[in-house]
């Protein structure tokens, strides 16, 4: 059982676009209220290979066996800016992606009001944020993960499946709670 908190939404309510495109139907998820204690659907996280602000390549498949905190944000987004110190602290607290948790930011250069890759990298450096932020230059990841608002954070379990998401800013305490919840749910 996922045991979703009030902060972490089930994946079935926001299945990434790659899972529903062309099906003709909206995906549905069983909930406890629908039919007792049924399990939410297992939805593989869309894989990607993108480059971060340091020029390093990141592929989701490279992190198999680790919990992933995937945060979609924008430099112009006030709530995003508000939670970034807590994301940096989470990144440092869990060993800078060397342990069981991988923290990745996702920025979409040129989308809407967003600046260039260089401007995003400068923003990160000037503010002391060292957690890797991959550049979704073709917006494929933003589309595949169904991003409708910033910030949005997806939790991906060690099996590479979507565990849940939060479509708003979080405190550091909530971030740690959803990370622990995702880790505890793994076999």
Give residue spans per PLM region:
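Gram-positive cell-envelope targeting signals
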Residues: 1-14, 68, 72-73, 79, ...
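N-terminal targeting signals for export/organelle localization
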Residues: 1-44, 187
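Thiol-/selenol-based redox modules, centered on thioredoxin-like
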Residues: 18, 155-187
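A short beta-strand-turn-helix
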Residues: 40-42, 47-68, 91-95
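Conserved redox-active cysteine motifs that mediate thiol-disulfide chemistry
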Residues: 64, 72-89
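Thiol-based oxidoreductase modules, predominantly thioredoxin-like and allied folds used
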Residues: 98-115, 129-138
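Short, internal strand/loop/helix patches
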Residues: 118-159
């Amino acid at each position: 059982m996922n045991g979703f908190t009030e902060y972490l939404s089930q994946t079935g309510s926001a299945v990434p676009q790659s899972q529903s495109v062309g099906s003709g139907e909206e995906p549905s998820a069983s909930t406890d209220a629908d039919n007792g204690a049924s399990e939410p659907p297992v939805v593989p996280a869309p894989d990607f290979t993108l480059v971060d602000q340091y020029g390093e390549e990141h592929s989701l498949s490279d992190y198999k066996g680790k919990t992933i905190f995937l945060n979609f944000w924008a430099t112009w987004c006030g709530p995003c800016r508000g939670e970034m110190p807590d994301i940096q602290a989470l990144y440092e607290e869990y060993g800078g992606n060397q342990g069981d948790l991988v923290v990745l930011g996702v920025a979409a250069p040129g989308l809407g009001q967003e600046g260039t890759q260089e401007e995003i990298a400068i923003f990160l450096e000037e503010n002391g944020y060292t957690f890797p932020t991959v550049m979704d230059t073709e917006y494929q990841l933003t589309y595949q993960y169904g991003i409708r608002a910033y910030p949005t954070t997806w939790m991906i379990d060690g099996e590479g499946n979507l565990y849940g998401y939060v479509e708003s800013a979080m405190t550091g305490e909530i971030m740690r709670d959803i990370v622990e919840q995702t880790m505890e749910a793994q076999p």
